[in-house]
Amino acid sequence: MNLHPTTRIRFFGVAAYEIVTRAGVRILMDPFLDENPGSPVRSDSFDKVDLVIVSHAAYDHLGDTEAIAKRYGCPVIAGGEVRAYLAAKGVPTTQVRATTWGIRVKVAGVEVQPVECHHWSQIKMPDGTFASGVPMAFVVYADDNVRFYHYGDTAIFSDMKLQAELYKPTIGCIGIANPQEILARNPMPGEMMTGEMSPYEGLLASQWLGLHTVLPCHYCQADDDDVRAFMRHHAAAKARGERTPDALVLNPGETIEVNTLGRIVSPKAA
């Protein structure tokens, strides 16, 4: 087998990511693509997909999982409510590995550790009823020294420190923004003041998780007030001498490369 020298991680906007391992395994996480105003990629843009991982049933995270599963025939890792929804939409149940916090699974040769996530997960089924389940964050064991934490829309909580001790994620995405392009699709009374984590909470979470590199996310455009606030908090923490992960703000469509030592080789982190 010819191995690529790096693990490649591409951001599509909001919380949608692609990991291509050194062996060429393509993993899509929370693949919200076709209706994502930031994504330059659509669900039919790939030559192959080897695995999809879904954190919860929100439309901007479940995204195009149904279309991708049907088009590429790839396995899906998700919670029970997502499995039930996909089955109702015609995806074979044998194609979906249901799991929850604590139950590590190995699919398509990739180990995935679901971890606690403080959020919700619900979806309207085709028959008009609603299904709810347990939202997940997860650690993807992509390659040696590349353990990717996907936050799954969680709020901050102190047991992130325990997750760091147990699973030792090296790089991860943390949601710190509240994109108006997405909120406008679901009007409600009043105003949503923050996302699941404020920029400061997101920085603190990245420290508690012990990440080497943090990728702030849940935005459609990198020129976002919350992203700028996150980077200000990051700079202030470094100036105070706190242990902080390197931080990278990615534009949708941008790719980073991680070497076999777990270090970012492209582009340069802050």
Language-model-detected regions and their locations in the chain:
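Short, surface-exposed amphipathic charged segments that create phosphate/polyanion-binding patches used
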Residues: A108-C117, D127-T129, N259-A270
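Zn-dependent metallo-beta-lactamase
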Residues: M1-R26, L33-P37, V115-H118, L162, ...
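Active-site metal-binding loops of divalent metal-dependent hydrolases
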Residues: P31-L33, A57, C117-H118, G152-T154, ...
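Cap/insert and terminal regions of metallo-dependent hydrolase folds
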Residues: E81, A155-E254
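Active-site HxH/HxHxD metal-binding segment of metal-dependent hydrolases
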Residues: V41-R104, G109-M125
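Beta-strand-turn-beta hairpins that frame and shape the catalytic cleft
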Residues: N2-T7, V20-I27, R104-Q113, A142-F148, ...
